[in-house]
């Protein structure tokens, strides 16, 4: 992933840089053709105060708005404090990774997924980032993935496999285990 300036505003990150990186990721991997005929919708909610919506058609046409959209495929929420600290510490891999690595397999997995998964990402200073993701507007079943920010970056970069992390104790999973396993295609 491109190095993101640690002083970038949330608005600039989510309205300009993130869509640019996602588009470049799809183009450079040659995945636009496989995404023809798809419409990926994403909503990012920061503390209920700021909302960013994305509609990506055919993997090439990106429409970004600073307002909510109805029935997004994926809705992500986190606190403004967590978002600002994620930017300042360069720990954006888990948040931005799926957008930059969208494939038809991940799109299809998301389309069929119904539930909520949470990530609790522990920082070196002991603080924790909390990211909540709701798929297809359904918030049950629920599972929580607990890992370090360093390990989450490795998952996003495909340097660590989630199942291996779970088996070795690097990641803990709480909640609905079947749903947790259903999320695996998003991270592999």
Task: Name each region found by the language model.
Residues 1-188:
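Feature captures hydrophobic
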């Amino acid at each position: 992933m491109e190095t993101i300036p640690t002083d970038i505003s949330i608005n600039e990150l989510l309205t300009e840089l993130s869509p640019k990186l996602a588009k470049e990721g799809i183009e450079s991997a040659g995945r636009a053709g496989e995404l023809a005929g798809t419409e990926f919708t994403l909503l990012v909610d920061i503390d209920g105060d700021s909302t960013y919506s994305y509609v990506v058609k055919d993997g090439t046409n990106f429409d970004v708005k600073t307002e909510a959209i109805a029935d997004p495929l994926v809705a992500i929420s986190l606190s403004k404090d967590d978002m600002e600290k994620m930017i300042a510490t360069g720990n954006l891999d888990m948040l931005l990774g799926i957008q930059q690595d969208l494939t038809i397999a991940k799109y299809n997995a998301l389309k069929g997924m119904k539930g909520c998964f949470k990530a609790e990402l522990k920082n070196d200073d002991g603080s924790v980032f909390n990211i909540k993701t709701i798929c297809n507007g359904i918030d049950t079943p629920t599972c929580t993935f607990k890992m370090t920010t360093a390990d989450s970056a490795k998952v996003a970069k495909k340097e660590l496999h989630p199942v291996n992390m779970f088996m070795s104790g690097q990641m803990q999973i709480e909640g609905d285990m079947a749903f947790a396993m259903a999320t695996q295609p998003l991270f592999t």
